[in-house]
Amino acid sequence: MKRLFIVVVVLVLASSILIGQELKPYTMGAQSSEALDVVREKTSQALVAAGFTILGEYQPAMDETRWVYVVNSTEMTEAVQENGELTGFAAALRVGLTVENDTVNISYTNPIYLGNAYFQKRFSDVEDKFLTVQDNLKKAMSDLGTVMDGAFGAKEGMTPKAIGKYHYMFGMEYFEDVVELTEFSSYSVGKSIIESKIAKGGDTQLVYAYEIPDHDLKLYGIALSGESGEEHFLPIIDISTPKHTAFLPYEILLMGNTAVMMHGRYRIALAFPDLTMTTFSKIISTPGAIEDLMRSVTE
């Protein structure tokens, strides 16, 4: 059964090679037969050796079969510094570990896919930096087991142009249609309020925080718990194989004196572009619930 599972995954990933310039949300980096705890340690070491800084890590949705590392690199920071504003969301990249059929899948958010989504028409100016990020991720995966290097997360990929203009359907939000959570009197006041409220715990827990040097930009990755949190919505939307573990955590971007988040109907759809309307209807309240949780740490 385990051998059959690996063969199926290889075939799914290999088909992505034929798509050429069409991109998918995730890359399967490697697969390992070792225990999750062992793979976690090896992954952490490999990422650092490949030039990444680990900003944070956590167990999404309190699921014992999953683990996420959030990383940053010099190239990612430089790209954001050159562009500022909403490109601050590109300051962090997620690496997901998932146990599926006794195999640990090590996957990550596709930096070229997200780069096109967050930089849009400006991505060509920073593409070389993200290609370096992609190459370094491949290097990190090379010592973690069977190297896969295949795209997944959608049956059909999207062109860079389509990703830059992406929305799920007519009437739904684009990348730039962010939710403005709170406007503070200043950037420093915003940082102080957000960080003091997160520290209180509850249904929001800080996974990482990263401030862009020489810019009034700070990105926070926040784990969401409670009855409307990750444990509620992730099992509903993450139903395909391989799993989209690197979808989480959700972010708040403090941009100057304003805290914003990507709209749930955009952020979820970008990570799960094949979601059917039937599945989307099952989480119809989730974008609003996420917004409420995020407001709880900004107001």
Q: For each predicted feature, which ranges?
A:
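Hydrophobic alpha-helical segments and helix pairs
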Residues: 106-152
